[in-house]
Amino acid sequence: MGKTFSCIIILLASSLCFAHKATAGIFRSDIVIAGGGTSGVTAAVQAARLGASVVVVEQTTWLGGMLTAAGVGAVDGNYNMPAGLWGEFRDSLAAHYGSLEALKTGWVSNVMFEPSVGNRIFHNMVAKEKGVMLWTGSEVKAVSHNGNMWAVHVARPDGQTDTVEAKVLVDATELGDIAKMCGVPYDVGMESQAVTHEDIAPAQANNIVQDLTYVAILKDYGRDMTMEKPEGYNANDFACCCINDKCITPKEPNRQWPKDKMVTYGKMPGGKYMINWPIEGNDFYANMVDMTPEQRNEAVRKAKAHTMRFVYFMQHELGFNTLALADDEYPTADRLPFMPYHRESRRIHGKVRFTLNHMTDPYEQAQPLYRTNIAVGDYPVDHHHTRYTGEEQLPDLHFHPVPSFGLPLGSLLPQEVKQLVVAEKSVSVSNIANGSTRLQPVVMQIGQAAGALAAIAVKQNKGVDEVSVREVQNVLLEAGGYLMPYADVPKDSICFKPCQRIGATGILKGKGVSIDWHNKTLFRPDAVVAWNDIAGLAEVYPFAAKLLRHDEEVSSVDTNGQSVDGQSVDALSVDALSVGDALSLVAAIAKQEKLMKRSAAMKVMASLAKEYDFCIDDRQRKIKRGELAVLIDGVLHPFEKKQVDVEGRFVR
């Protein structure tokens, strides 16, 4: 095959400018992003690359959020789907450490890194974008909207309050605090089965969130570094964190590991160790979502103390007395990260709600949300609840299997509030689905999509809910992103983009599989095309239904009732399409859609076959799925020409 057939949307325009100071204490920008975390930084970079001016407001001095400021230097999932800016970040890590193999130091992830290195990479990415103004050590205190512009009031490190006026506001905060300020309805905790229709959801809703973790980054000093016994220390709190003599009744007997495996779980390059241990380790329960600032500070204090008691247990009881908090990782007084690792936030009521059912059976739902995907993931549903001590019966959500999945654009859009895009872990997903969508590569893609959506809205002077789904998707695809979570069509494949685009129309559908930790969706580009494989063609082109019937009485016909190639479909192939069938079908649809005459379509398909390196001379040969995707994409352009709304339905 040859190069991909695609069109690149260029959004750079003179109407978009850098953020600037209008009057004393008032700045103007196209976009304000609250939060410079995992999604905030990618939103800023993507928006700036599309020509928008951006102000990023971040409470800490670091960029990257859970990946850096919270200490989770271990990327979960998407190793084989390096989508967009997540792929750029991974490549930058590999360049820093020497290779992708050099990142495989711990067994929890194939991408391990020191948080400080990740922070520098994110700062470098932002520094390259001249349209980004970065305000660190700053916090959004209030927001208002006058019908045209947002006024975002920001407390600065010097004690002053500055205001940024912007057309679009992006909430990339850790707990969705801006969405709450804006009056967006939201959920906290687990929804009931009646709400989400998920079989494994609880019968009754509750407000239980996942455990958070205050991560510790340790290093080996080569000498005894045992700390003083912390206040409130009780060895029984951690006795069953691993296999050891103190463990009598483990909460999770099937998840017991030797102590050395516990430590190497999060081994980082540079000889450091991430302590983010979920099995009776330093997970900590605190529902901080709706707490006051004072209550949050107290919860953070308790979470830190819990982690330090666990570090002492490791030193004193397990013999790891040469390990202690790294003195060259965080510039904090206590050497701990800037913030806890939040696994769950408030989740907005969005234009759509993404659930476990959309993950497991994307093609069987009332809303075909897969057509609107803007991010992909392949991590199982992973919930942490071992430190919760309430009486409620919680569903067993330890790595519930799912295939790889895509996240819809409508999950970033609140139902009512205009010109607000919500990112990070506050998107409109169910509590159960959040167990997969919360992981770092997905959240980075969410941010990139938020930035693209915001920038396009500014450029086109539209509401964020008026922007074409396909336009956002095309920008992401051209930026190296994935729309469909195909494991067998890698990004460097020559037919990657055609397969992505055709997959997003539903004309050819993927097949989800989950085997152990291998969660995949397969496009099967080299498989022959069965007739039922292209039932989706009639969803895009309703008149094509008659072309897909192949019983004894119905021939392959064009819409004027004429035989396309002089033979009935059955005469050519009952079970699978031949090359001749495919050419005839595509040519007939092109004619009906008034795209081109049959002869012109045949010429285009001959050119595409040459370009993409496959042969169409043997009309009896069974055509492959990847080949058919190229022909449909290159002649009919259904992705570009058949627009969809945020629910995935075609706009007729």
Task: Describe every region a protein language model picked out.
Residues A19-A24:
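Boundary at the C-terminal end of the N-terminal hydrophobic targeting segment
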Residues G137, A155-V168, A172-V475:
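Flavin (FAD/FMN)-binding glycine-rich loop and adjacent Rossmann-like elements that form
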Residues Y486-V489, F496-L508:
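Charged, amphipathic alpha-helical linkers/stalks
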Residues G40:
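N-terminal Rossmann-fold NAD(P) dinucleotide-binding loop
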Residues G25-G37:
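Beta1/beta-strand and adjacent pyrophosphate-binding region of the FAD-binding site
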